[in-house]
From Swiss-Prot:
Substrate binds at N11, Q44, N64, G74, N75, N157, N190, E208, R209, G218, S219. This is Diaminopimelate epimerase. The gene is dapF. Belongs to the diaminopimelate epimerase family. GO terms for molecular function: diaminopimelate epimerase activity. Its main location: cytoplasm. One of its GO terms (cellular component) is cytosol. Pathway: Amino-acid biosynthesis; L-lysine biosynthesis via DAP pathway; DL-2,6-diaminopimelate from LL-2,6-diaminopimelate: step 1/1. It comes from the Bacteria. Catalyzes the stereoinversion of LL-2,6-diaminopimelate (L,L-DAP) to meso-diaminopimelate (meso-DAP), a precursor of L-lysine and an essential component of the bacterial peptidoglycan.
Amino acid sequence: MQFSKMHGLGNDFMVVDAVTQNVFFSPELIRRLADRHLGVGFDQLLVVEPPYDPELDFHYRIFNADGSEVAQCGNGARCFARFVRLKGLTNKRDIRVSTANGRMVLTVTDDDLVRVNMGEPNFEPSAVPFRANKAEKTYIMRAAEQTILCGVVSMGNPHCVIQVDDVDTAAVETLGPVLESHERFPERANIGFMQVVKREHIRLRVYERGAGETQACGSGACAAVAVGIQQGLLDEEVRVELPGGRLDIAWKGPGHPLYMTGPAVHVYDGFIHL
């Protein structure tokens, strides 16, 4: 099986063309491939499939390193767009794809950045899903013997965003896994720790569902900005500084899609016998 290794700000992926290759990934195989000592090593596996709808170009599938399939990965979406052009699967700059729970438009810019229409953030608890009686801008949660104030949003996948004074000292390693599997998130969640530097600049660390802390989380950056705007903390255009680098997020508010712009890097091509 041929594959490519790619990354978006250090969030790394194994990307496989299932348009011209016949492939099947069991959870066990994915876990073996994800092992950084015995396999290829990655945060997520991205699979390019033929479209299910003639109006679309491809179907986009995402698997975490633990073998679980998820519906969204923003950094992966940028790498997906770069991959299909590099491999000659399309020469379009506007690439329309379906995911497990919707559709996306990926735009490759002239300077090889990728702009992703991530859709409109959904704050309804049932959409996340999150157990709550009604939608609130801020929720109170109990976790690890602490009272946590957080915002909750779906970007096609579940996110919880906590504001912290300093991301460098935030309890990502301890609080992240506790909140990820909190009973109020029946499908688990990605946990973002957000430091507001200015109204147009945040710092962010994300503990990803099924992957742990990563160098960058695209949908997590989108979620943090959406929650920050909803809570009145941020402007419509925000620079997000992650451990792996920078993303630019723009959202005009309810009724509008959110846009993420950032790099996608091709590292190498490989071949593996399964």
